[in-house]
Amino acid sequence: MSRNPFMQNMPEIQAAGGLVPMVIEQSARGERAYDIYSRLLKERVIFLVGQVEDYMANLICAQLLFLEAENPDKDIHLYINSPGGSVTAGMAIYDTMQFIKADVSTTCIGQACSMGAFLLAGGAKGKRFCLPNSRVMIHQPLGGFQGQASDIEIHAKEILFIRERLNELLAHHTGQSLETIERDTNRDNFMSAPRAVEYGIVDAVHEKRQMPV
């Protein structure tokens, strides 16, 4: 039985009983069983599902680097269904997406909120998509540090720096002005799939697949 060493330990799957579908393939050498994520990884498909956190980020970065090593000239497909999460974990994924040679095509299924929306926008230009009923949400990073006054001041400066950097990158990927991004991320800003296209977060809404993954 083949198991994906990079498979994400997703809380949603565990909550459903830890059941991961298996795929049986026939070959001249006999049967071979894959978990569904390992089988999709063979097709250069990666899933980002749930909260963005360090463990997930490490696994996704590893998968991106692995697929680039296999074929640096073939697209990688990242499917996103996430409410957001850690900025530093998300930036690790984002930087790896930009670092590797292979184009990373992003697709929102369900929702791409906060850091999920940022990663959606960070896909290769012309290869960023939403499914018709998916939702996208952008906003400014959240803070909540507690401690001594001097430490709170330090962390306040850090979160302001992070907000500025995220806004600059989002402006770059969407084509919106920095002033527009700053205004539109001041509060939770939800978008439909067509609105996400208008805004520049994605390039198109896909209703039917027109080509293999």
UniProtKB/Swiss-Prot annotation:
Subcellular localization: Cytoplasm
Chief location: cytoplasm
GO BP annotations, alphabetical order: protein quality control for misfolded or incompletely synthesized proteins
The protein's enzyme class: hydrolase
Enzyme Commission number(s) of this protein: 3.4.21.92
Active site: 114 (nucleophile), 139
Molecular functions per Gene Ontology: ATP-dependent peptidase activity; ATPase binding; serine-type endopeptidase activity
Spans through the membrane: none
Catalytic reaction annotation: Hydrolysis of proteins to small peptides in the presence of ATP and magnesium. alpha-casein is the usual test substrate. In the absence of ATP, only oligopeptides shorter than five residues are hydrolyzed (such as succinyl-Leu-Tyr-|-NHMec, and Leu-Tyr-Leu-|-Tyr-Trp, in which cleavage of the -Tyr-|-Leu- and -Tyr-|-Trp bonds also occurs)
Pfam family, one: CLP_protease
Keywords in alphabetical order: Cytoplasm, Hydrolase, Protease, Serine protease
GO cellular component labels: cytoplasm; endopeptidase Clp complex
Function per UniProt: Cleaves peptides in various proteins in a process that requires ATP hydrolysis. Has a chymotrypsin-like activity. Plays a major role in the degradation of misfolded proteins.
Family (UniProt): Belongs to the peptidase S14 family.
Subunit structure: Fourteen ClpP subunits assemble into 2 heptameric rings which stack back to back to give a disk-like structure with a central cavity, resembling the structure of eukaryotic proteasomes.
PANTHER family, alphabetized: ATP-DEPENDENT CLP PROTEASE PROTEOLYTIC SUBUNIT
Protein name: ATP-dependent Clp protease proteolytic subunit
Organism: Ectopseudomonas mendocina (strain ymp) (Pseudomonas mendocina)
Gene name per UniProt: clpP
